[in-house]
């Protein structure tokens, strides 16, 4: 990528592109008879030889076809990449997808409806040649490979990459009949059956493959946005992404035995906007195989959570699902690496969590073992000032951005804990973070006149920063008082003994806070007077909770999981016997606690009348 940036700093894209083609031909001693390629290379100014030596061929390297192809993929301005939703597809992804859709039919027809620089067309060419070695490269290009893209530069690149692949293998015809067209694939005026009658005489394509663009609907022109909403069922409502209708299109273009293979974001599984697409996929039962990369980044230069999906025109009884947990450079997966997911477990109106029957049974065991956490405890988020930099203090002496210093009175401050950075009880003991607290013991706002009289320094400070406070919440007036917190939440519920946890954790991390006068921000509290909080902490930090969250919660980069209320609230707390409670109270070895709890949650099928209610 750095080499491309260096070239883009000095030359325009067509100059770089044509220079790379010429360098590749020269480096590999290739002469072309192809009219399209010769016209393309006619009359352009080559990049400087010094840049060829220092950047393209640095350290005496040869411009191999793989490197050339990589340059072509990266030759989009960063701005264009963002707006066009274009991301470089790793070769192992394209190879896996093509392997999944390729058949034994020598007349196999495969389309990439957003072909970009031609990676899927190229991989399809090689895979078909490998399966049918008697077919020439040109014959495959002319009879098996199809492409479409909205950008002429992309369809040209696809043609060039296919010409060079044939040329590299000794095939040098003057003309090649390409099945690559320049058009918006989502435009319903495009009559695919008229463009490619030889395909649709058999009902459609044998396969559709690709890496469709990822563009949120709010980044599209209004007219195009309305067009998609009016013409594609998957896009009719919500903040959809343009890859949704590409999936719908791909399924529409398949013949009765066809397969669709895409790499896309996995957001349609769990967003409200993905509901209409989920309805289509469930009603058709078209999902056949899914490799979910979860929090693993496939595209190194962009933060997209991805999945590979293989769909079929014919309905499937089950979905073969695999979640990846580490970075890979190939997808050499066996059938036993997948778990089977029943379509009946998926509700289009809700987020999709792909679970096997065994996992569903274990989740049911966990949630129904006793009392749900939400019925036993209060689960609340912390205070929300909407201006933490103003209200939070590490020292009572505060200096503002414009150099004014104020000595805030301790009497208007409370101790506050930042749950998002909290690891253990020792950090609570060492915590010196304070918050200006303009509320009385009942949680009501202290009158402005009272603050001015009792806490003149704090009042002067708040008046000084009032312009910033007034900008909170998009400038809407604060209905309580201009110096009140931005939200009412947790003002009267965040004190007392509690368990604190961050919204995101690598593993369960519920920390006991015995300081009743401390409030908190940036996380959740779990409070109850029905059970010893230190015993509850051991349960919530157990391997059972980690397993449960691993199955039902949202993933983030690095393997972190969400511990938001919506994910932890249905976790079940068993009805322990007095003897079991005594064990939990006295045992501090978490491994022994885990073993004990796993037996209760998963092996103790019948609860007897001897069990006590929660204390």
Question: What is the predicted role of each segment?
Answer:
Residues 38, 42, 226-234, 436:
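A solvent-exposed, charged loop/short amphipathic helix patch at secondary-structure junctions
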Residues 251, 352-354, 358-583, 590-612:
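Polybasic, glycine- and aromatic-enriched phosphate-binding surface used to engage nucleic acids
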Residues 1-150, 154-157, 212, 239, ...:
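Class I S-adenosyl-L-methionine
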Residues 92-93, 115-122, 129, 150, ...:
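Signature of N6-adenine DNA methyltransferases within the class I
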Residues 147, 177, 181-184:
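Conserved residues in the N-terminal Rossmann fold of short-chain dehydrogenase/reductase
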Residues 108, 178, 206, 288, ...:
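Conserved acidic residues
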């Amino acid at each position: 990528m750095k080499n491309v940036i260096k070239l883009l700093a000095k030359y325009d894209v067509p100059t770089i592109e044509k220079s790379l083609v010429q360098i590749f031909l020269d480096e590999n001693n290739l002469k072309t008879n192809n009219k399209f390629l010769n016209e393309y290379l006619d009359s352009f100014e080559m990049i400087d030889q010094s840049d060829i030596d220092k950047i393209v061929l640095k350290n005496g390297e040869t411009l191999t076809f793989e490197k050339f192809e990589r340059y072509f993929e990266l030759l989009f301005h960063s701005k264009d990449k963002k707006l066009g939703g274009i991301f470089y597809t790793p070769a192992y992804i394209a190879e896996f997808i093509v392997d999944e859709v390729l058949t034994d039919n020598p007349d196999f027809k495969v389309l990439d409806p957003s072909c970009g620089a031609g990676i899927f067309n190229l991989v399809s060419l090689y895979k078909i040649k490998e399966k049918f070695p008697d077919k020439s490269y040109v014959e495959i290009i002319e009879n098996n490979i199809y492409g479409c893209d909205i950008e002429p530069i992309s369809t040209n690149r696809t043609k060039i990459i296919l010409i060079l692949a044939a040329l590299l293998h000794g095939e040098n015809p003057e003309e090649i009949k390409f099945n690559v067209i320049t058009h918006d694939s989502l435009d319903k005026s495009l009559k695919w059956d008229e463009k490619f009658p030889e395909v649709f005489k058999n009902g459609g394509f044998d396969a559709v493959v690709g890496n469709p663009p990822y563009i949120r609907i709010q980044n599209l022109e209004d007219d195009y946005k309305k067009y998609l909403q009016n013409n594609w069922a998957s896009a009719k409502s919500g903040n959809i992404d343009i890859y949704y209708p590409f999936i719908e299109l791909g399924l529409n273009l398949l013949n009765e035995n066809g397969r669709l293979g895409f790499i896309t974001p996995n957001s349609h599984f769990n967003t409200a906007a993905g509901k209409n697409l989920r309805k289509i996929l469930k009603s058709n039962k078209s999902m056949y195989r899914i490799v979910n990369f979860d929090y693993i980044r496939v595209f190194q230069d962009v933060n997209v959570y991805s999945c590979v999906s293989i769909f079929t025109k014919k309905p499937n009884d089950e979905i073969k699902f695999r979640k990846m947990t580490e970075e890979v450079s190939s997808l050499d997966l066996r059938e036993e690496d997948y778990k089977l997911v029943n379509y009946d477990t998926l509700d289009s109106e809700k987020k999709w969590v792909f679970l096997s029957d065994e996992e569903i049974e274990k989740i049911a065991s966990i949630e129904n073992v006793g009392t749900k956490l939400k019925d036993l405890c209060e689960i609340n988020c912390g205070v929300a000032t909407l201006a933490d930099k103003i209200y939070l203090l590490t020292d009572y002496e505060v200096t503002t951005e414009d150099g004014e210093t104020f000595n805030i009175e301790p009497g208007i401050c409370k101790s506050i804990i930042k749950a998002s950075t909290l690891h253990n009880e020792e950090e609570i003991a060492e915590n010196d973070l304070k918050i200006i607290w303009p509320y009385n013991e009942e949680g009501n706002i202290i009158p402005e006149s009272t603050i001015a009289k009792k806490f003149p320094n704090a009042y002067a400070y708040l008046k000084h920063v009032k312009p910033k406070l007034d900008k909170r919440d998009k400038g809407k007036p604060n209905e309580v008082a201009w110096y009140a917190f931005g939200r009412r939440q947790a003002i009267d519920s965040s004190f007392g003994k509690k368990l604190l946890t961050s919204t995101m954790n690598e593993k369960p991390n519920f920390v006991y806070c015995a300081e009743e006068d401390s409030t908190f921000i940036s996380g959740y509290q779990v409070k109850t007077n029905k059970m010893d909080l230190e015993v509850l902490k051991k349960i919530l930090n157990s391997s059972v909770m980690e397993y449960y969250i691993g199955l039902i919660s949202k993933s983030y980069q690095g393997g972190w999981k969400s511990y938001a209320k919506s994910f932890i609230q249905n976790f079940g707390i068993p009805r322990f016997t007095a003897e079991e409670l005594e064990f939990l109270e006295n045992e501090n070895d978490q491994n022994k606690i885990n073993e004990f709890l796993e037996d209760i949650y998963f092996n103790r099928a019948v609860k007897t009348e001897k069990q006590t209610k929660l204390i």
